Amino acid sequence: LDALNNAQSSGNPYNIESVQVIISSGVMWSAEVKQGLLEHHDMKLMDTMGSTEGGMGSSVTTRDNPPATAKFGLNPGVIVLADDGEILEPGSEKIGLIGTSGLVPVGYYKDEKKSAETFREVNGIRYSFPGDYAKLESDGTITLLGRGSNCINSAGEKIYPEEVEEAIKRNKEVFDCLVVGVNDDRFGQKVVAVVSLEEKIDAEALIEQTRKFIAGYKLPKEILFVDRVERA
């Protein structure tokens, strides 16, 4: 999107009229980025969710279908399972693990513990649970929260880094962001954000602006500014 915007600003825009579909998987694709792409060209944006163990859901955005962040229609045979073993129904206030049935692997090679955690039977049906948590909305779609193993436990509250990252990136001053949990004597863990900027802003102002998008307890306790956010 940045390349398209920069080329257009310089008066030498790319010709992308032949592009019909863009498919994304494995990263958080925000509504703002989708909207920006559609402003350049009318096409289909397919956002897919899955893992090595199996596909789970997808969404398609067009100019006639407003974009959303981390919202997917579920594939057949996919459930959301609460930690207490309840299969969630649309509109439930609980969150749960996403599980997919069908062609489920036998297990991980020489890793019985991980196999038992990931591949389980529910009501006689074998499912794969890679570890992603979601909320099942009243319309039958899910809102993906994030991977349970990445969840930050701060003062007894569960905070998903992906949600905080997307909230911070909604600020026009932010170019990129990565959120992690850091051990803390008071909270157990605290939310820390690593941020690269598009425009100058201080940490206090950025936190205050982000308060419009997420609950206060999810806000970062500390922000580290860097020239570039590095990912392995």
Model-derived features: positions:
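Acidic-histidine catalytic/liganding microenvironments
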Residues: 112, 122, 168-172
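Conserved beta-loop-beta connector loops within the AMP-binding
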Residues: 79-100, 136-139, 199-203
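Gly/Ser/Thr-rich phosphate-binding loop
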Residues: 7-67, 77-79, 89-90
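Short Gly/Pro-enriched turn/cap motifs at secondary-structure boundaries
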Residues: 67-73, 118, 124-125
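AMP-binding/adenylate-forming catalytic core of the ANL superfamily
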Residues: 50, 101, 106-107, 117, ...
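Core-facing hydrophobic residues within beta-strands of well-ordered domains
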Residues: 16-19, 75, 174, 220
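Beta-strand->loop->alpha-helix junctions that form or flank phosphate-binding loops
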Residues: 46-53, 70-72, 180-183, 224
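Short proline/glycine- and acidic-rich turn/helix-capping motifs at secondary-structure junctions
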Residues: 223-232
